[in-house]
């Protein structure tokens, strides 16, 4: 596990983009993408670059259940606004936030991941150590599944909604096994609120109580973080 300390998210985005260029030069075809504020500067680097992504495939980590892709709070909308509209991919897959038939969607998305092995997976990390929407207690052998969101996750994401009652309580997420199946992983972490989770991820015991600690079992993980997020290491 490699840890790179950066001044801020802008520098973090640039560092990650250099890693991406190296992976693309070595033949990477499929990117695993994340939402939230942590990867935004990385996506800006992609958008502003002259690289052609029209032959690449992307698969996203997760999506809220109950939000249509046209909903501004959905992760599909986020990806369209921040990346896909400006830099089209050949194919872009996200879980569908369908309420009525989540089990079928889980099966569909697991098949998509089987058909499109991820070369480089982008991650953020939750204050409780979640990656994707894999909350504490998620088995390390889990694949795509329906998640009941932890209250701390709902509270952390409430800033994106008019009120906390509007935050969905379920999501469909890649499982930890899906994430670990990626050839390479970049995890972004910024701010003091992530320090405890990062300390456990890097140097704590590998435990299902801290989902990100599973990354210690992966051969090619790069953590890009600021001083605050690294303050407990």
UniProtKB/Swiss-Prot annotation:
Any one annotated GO CC term: cytoplasm
The entry's keywords: Carbohydrate metabolism, Hydrolase
Keyword Zinc-finger: no
Record-annotated active site: 62 (proton acceptor), 128 (for ring-opening step), 130 (proton acceptor), 135 (for ring-opening step)
One GO BP: carbohydrate metabolic process
Keyword NADP tagged: no
Superkingdom: Bacteria
EC number(s) on file: 3.5.99.6
Family: Belongs to the glucosamine/galactosamine-6-phosphate isomerase family. NagB subfamily.
Name of the protein in its database record: Glucosamine-6-phosphate deaminase
Organism: Streptococcus pneumoniae serotype 4 (strain ATCC BAA-334 / TIGR4)
């Amino acid at each position: 596990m490699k840890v790179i300390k950066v001044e801020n998210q802008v520098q973090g985005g640039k560092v990650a983009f250099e890693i991406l260029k190296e992976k693309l030069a070595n033949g990477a075809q499929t990117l695993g993408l994340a939402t939230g504020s942590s990867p935004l500067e990385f996506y800006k680097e992609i958008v502003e670059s002259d690289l052609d992504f029209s032959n690449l495939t992307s698969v996203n980590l997760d999506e809220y259940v109950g939000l249509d892709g046209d909903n501004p709070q959905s992760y599909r909308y986020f990806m369209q606004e921040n990346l896909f509209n400006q830099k089209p991919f050949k194919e872009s897959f996200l879980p569908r936030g369908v309420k009525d038939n989540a089990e079928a969607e889980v099966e569909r998305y697991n098949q998509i991941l089987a058909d499109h092995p991820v070369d480089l997976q982008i991650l953020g990390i939750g204050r409780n150590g979640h990656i994707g929407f894999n909350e504490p207690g998620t088995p390390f052998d889990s694949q795509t599944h329906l998640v009941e969101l932890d209250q701390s996750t709902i509270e952390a994401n409430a800033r994106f909604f008019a009120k906390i009652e509007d935050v969905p309580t379920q999501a469909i997420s890649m499982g930890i096994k899906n994430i670990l199946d990626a050839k390479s992983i970049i995890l972004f972490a910024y701010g003091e609120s992530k320090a405890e989770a990062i300390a456990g991820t890097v140097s704590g015991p590998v435990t299902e109580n801290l989902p990100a600690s599973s990354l210690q079992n992966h051969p090619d993980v790069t953590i890009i973080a600021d001083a605050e997020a690294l303050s407990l290491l």
